[in-house]
Amino acid sequence: HGIEAPEGLDHDMHHMVGWAHPDLVLGQICNLPYRAQFRENVTTLCAIDYEIPGSPAGFYHSVFVVRDDDPAQSPVDAATYRLAYNEPLSNSGYGAPQLWAASRGFQFSPFMHTHAHRNSIEAVATGKADICAIDAHTFWIDRDLELMNSVKVIGRTHDTPGMTLITRAGQDRAPYLVAIRQALEAVPTAIKSELRLRGIVELPASAYDIPMPNIPA
């Protein structure tokens, strides 16, 4: 397709460095760091469609999770709860729940930084935190974990663009989209079914026009 690319992947480069690299061929980025730091400096290609129930193609939402014996019936009931979040620049774990809360006149506080969605679920299950927001796809993948027996879902966030594929700035999107679609066609059906990987969606730029949350230091 006329796309110059190295023979192998660089497994050592930090993802934040990779997204900003002038030779970036293809990257997958969460929409919060994309909006916060990279939107004007990359070529946006498409969003991945994981067939999230209740969300449009190419979009996703997070589910609010509390302990299974918690009396909260909705996230509003948990307004003063300690929020476990994976990363401050995670839309699913931090940005989306805080924007959902802001639309209802509050912010989740205090916080607990866990570095991973699964760690956030464990923090809630073990009582170290009171609530967390987990992207619906990850929650589905982790559905059989034993710790899931100790938590329950009490709500969901608004829909936002799913994991987004990007390349370096100034590139023609067309050959990349053709190559990505052909690569997805070559993935065995069983694997796509296991991941619920339906394909890619070209979203309008306006889909990413979402208010920025206050990012914790």
Predicted regions and their residues:
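Extracytoplasmic small-molecule ligand-binding "clamshell" domains
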Residues: H1-R35
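A basic- and aromatic-enriched beta-loop-alpha substructure that forms the phosphate/nucleotide-
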Residues: L26-S62
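Bilobed "Venus flytrap"/periplasmic-binding protein-like clamshell domains
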Residues: P56-S120, A190-E202, D209-I215
